[in-house]
């Protein structure tokens, strides 16, 4: 069995993992980053959106940011292995990997920065070629520079679909709308306009449409039902793309390729009305958001908690991003669904936490304090919030950690 030894093994080459690896390497630790994708960088590689105040022109270009991060990591001496899938994690700590020049990494400490996975809602006909996840469409356009279709509809109303709809439009794809999924056993609140509006009102300040911002100021979570009833059946436009809260895609049409969809008008609570129409198109993008990819944390023996406000099941962690499993740290979307800026800031906190745990950093070091302050600042000012009750989720997580503090070093 081929073996590689190091001070720190980082699982996941996104912004959280890379930032942590860079700081740990600069602090004198030997670091190996394992990433399953052909190119490291995580979801940064597919991100392109406006971000007021960022850079010279107010655009967030994830690929450029990823290149800069990776260059810093390599200059710090971080070894980055792409195309390497981690399939197991044994105590003390042996990382089992496939696709690398070695089969096992023996590390004193492990950072799990595996990110998140996209959820989909089943729609009749969703296995027809031309029906893909919204995240896949984003990769086609922003990573490979390929338009996955000419005329598209988004299924699912959430931050992810709204963001990617605009990215598709910027790439020259005609996006006919962002519609609801059909009501069913797997769609739950995602198919209920009232519940969707309740979530959107919590994020109305970020809305690109003045009408949506006004709606957020008028309606609250308690009056979301009224907002859903009054929502125009023809939709409200976001960047010239109709947001169709009172229309659901109930079927994807086609044989060897998507040729269109069936759209049905729905009530304020998602019930079908029987009023249907067909729309010709060649691309359907489905998404019900993201959930934390936390299986390796479970395998490591980390204590977990179900926190819907953070997107699902997440590991409990402390102020240094340490978990209850000795020597195991976490950062990024495995801790809850947030934006890339927050993940990058968490990576810095984890990096300094790892150095502190290794005895390479004095207690309350100014750099560590600055990293925590940066995380709080970035989180408070984040332009993208995937879950409206994020603060409640973070509070729950902090309360759950308190009695466990000290279990991990």
Residue ranges with predicted function:
Residues 2-409:
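Residues forming the flavin
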């Amino acid at each position: 069995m081929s073996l590689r030894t190091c001070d720190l093994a980082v699982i996941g080459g996104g912004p959280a993992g890379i930032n942590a690896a860079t700081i740990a390497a600069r602090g004198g630790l030997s670091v190996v980053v394992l990433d399953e994708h052909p190119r490291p960088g995580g979801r940064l590689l597919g991100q392109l959106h406006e971000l007021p105040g960022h850079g010279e022109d107010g655009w967030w270009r994830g690929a450029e940011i990823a290149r800069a991060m990776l260059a810093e990591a390599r200059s710090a001496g971080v070894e980055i292995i792409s195309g390497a899938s981690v399939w197991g994690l044994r105590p003390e700590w042996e990382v089992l990997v496939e696709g690398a020049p070695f089969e096992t990494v023996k590390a004193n400490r492990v950072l799990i920065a595996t990110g998140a996975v996209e959820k989909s809602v089943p729609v009749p006909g969703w296995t027809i070629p031309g029906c893909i996840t919204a995240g896949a469409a984003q990769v086609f356009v922003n990573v490979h520079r390929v338009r996955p279709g000419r005329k598209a509809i988004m299924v699912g109303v959430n931050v992810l679909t709204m963001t990617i709809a605009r990215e598709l439009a910027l790439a020259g794809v005609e996006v006919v709308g962002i519609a609801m999924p059909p009501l069913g056993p797997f769609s739950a609140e995602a198919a209920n306009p009232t519940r969707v509006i309740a979530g959107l009102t919590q994020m109305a300040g970020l809305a690109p449409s003045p009408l949506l911002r006004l709606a957020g100021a008028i309606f609250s979570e308690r009056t979301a039902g009224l907002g859903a009833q009054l929502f125009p059946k023809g939709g409200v436009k976001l960047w010239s793309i109709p947001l169709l809260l009172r229309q659901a895609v109930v079927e994807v049409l086609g044989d060897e390729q998507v040729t269109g969809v069936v759209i049905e008008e729905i009530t304020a609570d998602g019930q079908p009305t029987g009023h249907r129409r067909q729309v010709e198109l060649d691309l359907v993008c489905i998404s019900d958001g993201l959930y934390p990819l936390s299986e390796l944390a479970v395998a490591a023996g980390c204590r977990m908690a179900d926190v819907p406000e953070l997107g699902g099941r997440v590991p409990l962690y402390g102020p240094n991003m340490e978990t209850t499993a000795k020597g195991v740290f976490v950062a990024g979307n495995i801790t809850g669904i947030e934006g890339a800026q927050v993940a990058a800031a968490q990576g810095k906190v984890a990096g300094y936490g790892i150095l502190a745990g290794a005895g390479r950093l004095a207690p309350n070091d100014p750099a560590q304090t600055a990293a925590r302050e940066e995380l709080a600042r970035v989180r408070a000012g984040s332009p993208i919030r995937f879950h409206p009750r994020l603060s409640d989720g973070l509070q729950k997580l902090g309360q759950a950690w308190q009695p466990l503090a000290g279990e991990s070093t």
